[in-house]
Amino acid sequence: MPMSGRVRIPDGISSELASAAGCALRTVVHGFDRLGRLTDLETVVIQGAGPLGLFSLAAAIRAGAGRTILIGAPAKRLDVARRWGADHVLNIDEARDPQRRLERILDLTDGLGPDVVIEVSGGATAFPEGLDMIRRGGRYLVIGQVSGESVSMKPSVFTQKHIQVIGVLLGAVEHYYKALAFLSANRERFAFDEMLTNRYRLDQINLALTAMQRFDEVKPVVIPEVG
């Protein structure tokens, strides 16, 4: 509906998925709009395995990335990433040392590093880690940094490696429209419902938040009703 700030949910898309698209996928779509074209010669590393990370994986695959690597935890989320088509996953619960993760990524990219890194973990220390792993001339899409926490880094890395850094927060109604269209066009390619985990009543919302903090949930669904 032009000029209204409202979009129509496509047939076959549940209210739960449409809600997820209104935040996580809308942000990813905005980020990919700003990131630009991907080619089948490029490797994309995604830092984070939550809704932003899984949507970024799907978007990178559909955008034509040659290879995708997802870093995150817990194992159940990485299993979803594998089923969706990630070429490699790296479990941070099994590789807690950043240097070990860097070495693994370099091994997978012939020592060059990835062409594109997408930060969606929300962890401040992920940012300098991404800068370390990205190849010369690479692009770094930063979506997850909202905490305001400070980290140590060397600004010279931007000039020495010719890195382009792109920051994105949320998106406009046009990105929500594109997000819903993405769900509709790719619902048979990716089992998006795998992200929607347990359902909670409104009076159980604190239970849902606690479960998310424990990483027991990917995207819990809160139903606007009470017991």
Where are the predicted features?
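Hydrophobic/small residue at the entry helix of a nucleotide-binding pocket
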Residues: 27, 52, 60
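C-terminal capping/lid region of NAD(P)-dependent oxidoreductase domains
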Residues: 91, 111, 136, 141, ...
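Adenosine-nucleotide cofactor-binding segment
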Residues: 46-49, 61-129
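NAD(P)H dinucleotide-binding glycine-rich loop of Rossmann-like/cofactor-binding domains
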Residues: 1-47, 97, 190
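C-terminal substrate-binding/catalytic core of Rossmann-like NAD(P)-dependent dehydrogenases/reductases
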Residues: 98-106, 146-197, 207, 216
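Glycine-rich Rossmann-fold phosphate-binding loop(s) that bind the pyrophosphate
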Residues: 24, 48-51, 73, 145
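Conserved helix-to-beta-strand junction in the class I
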Residues: 132-134
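Residues at the starts of beta-strands that form the adenosine-phosphate
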Residues: 43, 66-68, 139, 164
